[in-house]
């Protein structure tokens, strides 16, 4: 069977295919294909993974948008836990507030003000970042992923509804593929959908003979990092004060918004 998703030819030329079906497994296998020769794979929750189709565009954009938007709160509040320097700065500000105002009421309100400013800047920057993504690769998934050599985009479908997305973007020079845009509808999490999507990218990388898979994330939630580790990824570094589109680098922005960018890698074979 000819595989249409190699790195030397567009992976999704009509009819769209980014890879062959998984090898046949025992009947009723949780991750095995539903029938011989079928494209989709099925999880135990009856979730099918298939290639992106043009009709999925708005559903995929919605899932991506809502998934990133969730990071507003986590970046503003939970992220402070991993920013000891800012914690110290805020403590000094609160102390100075009391020294200057001599007001216990004003001083007690200062932490709420600081958290409010963190939320404001987190929302402002993340929404700007989202708009940038929606104007670039997520504006035309078909063109950016399905028609590019070594790239592909998949959706997870449950009962006819798109509930999850993931993309793979190949880099032939480094012989690596990047796992991108993974997100699952918040109403359908905890069903193993994200792990199945991640495995789809692993399968794609192996079939295309890439040496490794890389990904980067600013996610604060521990569950996201545990997911990558469960797929075999190794944490290879973190970039403090990560810059995203939409940032102005102002003093107030640096004071109330910081991102940590985690890099992961899964080595498939030695070069």
Swiss-Prot record:
Gene coding for it: nat8l
Residue ranges of the TM segments: 89-109
Disordered as annotated region, ranges: 1-38
Catalytic activity of the protein: L-aspartate + acetyl-CoA = N-acetyl-L-aspartate + CoA + H(+)
Topology within the bilayer: Single-pass membrane protein
SUPFAM superfamilies: Acyl-CoA N-acyltransferases (Nat) (SSF55729)
Gene Ontology cellular-component annotations: endoplasmic reticulum membrane; intracellular membrane-bounded organelle; mitochondrial membrane; mitochondrion
Species of provenance: Xenopus tropicalis
Function of the protein: Catalyzes the synthesis of N-acetylaspartate acid (NAA) from L-aspartate and acetyl-CoA.
Family annotation (InterPro entries): Acyl_CoA_acyltransferase (IPR016181), GNAT_dom (IPR000182), NAT_camello-type (IPR050769)
Domain of life, source organism: Eukaryota
Positions with biased composition (Low complexity): 25-37
Compartmental location: Cytoplasm; Microsome membrane; Mitochondrion membrane; Endoplasmic reticulum membrane
Stated family: Belongs to the NAT8 family.
Keywords of the record: Acyltransferase, Cytoplasm, Endoplasmic reticulum, Membrane, Microsome, Mitochondrion, Transferase, Transmembrane, Transmembrane helix
GO molecular function: L-aspartate N-acetyltransferase activity
Protein EC: 2.3.1.17
N-acetyltransferase domain segment(s): 115-258
Listed name of the protein: N-acetylaspartate synthetase
Regions of compositional bias (Pro residues) in chain numbering: 12-24
